[in-house]
Amino acid sequence: MILPALKIKSFNPTERVLMGPGPSDVSDRVLRAMASPTLGHLDPEFISMMNETKELLQYVFQTKNEWTFAVSAPGSAGMECCFANLIESGDKVIVCQNGVFGGRMRENVERCGGEAIMVNDKWGCPVDLEKVEMALKEHPDASIVAFVHAETSTGVESD
């Protein structure tokens, strides 16, 4: 098969204000940053930036803990990192599920040797605090309560 001669040109859409659920407008500052050269995670400049980020996180959380760090990975990797460092075999963990990522938390808890005590809510609804209180009363030996603040699979926020 022979491809027809194509007139390849740059794609330059006209500027718009996006008002739907996504994608959303990106600020000029972010667009400029996205056009910057890519740094690898072992590049000295990247490591320097991560060290500065660590200092800022220590300030925000008012800690001098040397183990403070930002995770240079997707959110799921950060979640798994937390569980792997906090859960010991047999720990009870109250896990709230109202979307995909609550289920992923359950999987992580179980992979780390913990027992997931599930508090299930309808997908797309915030976590029901009364259910969490009931789970805490039924399982006072639970060492962790875990929930997804912004459940991106359903677009719901839980506080």
Please describe what each predicted stretch is:
Residues 1-43:
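N-terminal "arm"/small-domain region of PLP-dependent enzymes with the aminotransferase-like
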Residues 33-81, 100, 104-110:
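Conserved N-terminal alpha-helix of the aminotransferase class I/II PLP-enzyme fold
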Residues 72, 120, 146-149:
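Short beta-strand segments
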Residues 84-89, 111-112:
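Alpha-helix C-terminal capping segments
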Residues 87-103:
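Conserved PLP-anchoring active-site segment centered on the Schiff-base-forming lysine
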Residues 97, 119-122:
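Short beta->alpha connector loops at strand-helix junctions that form conserved
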Residues 104-115, 122, 133-135:
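Active-site-proximal loop->helix
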Residues 127-159:
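Active-site phosphate-binding strand-loop segment of PLP-dependent enzymes
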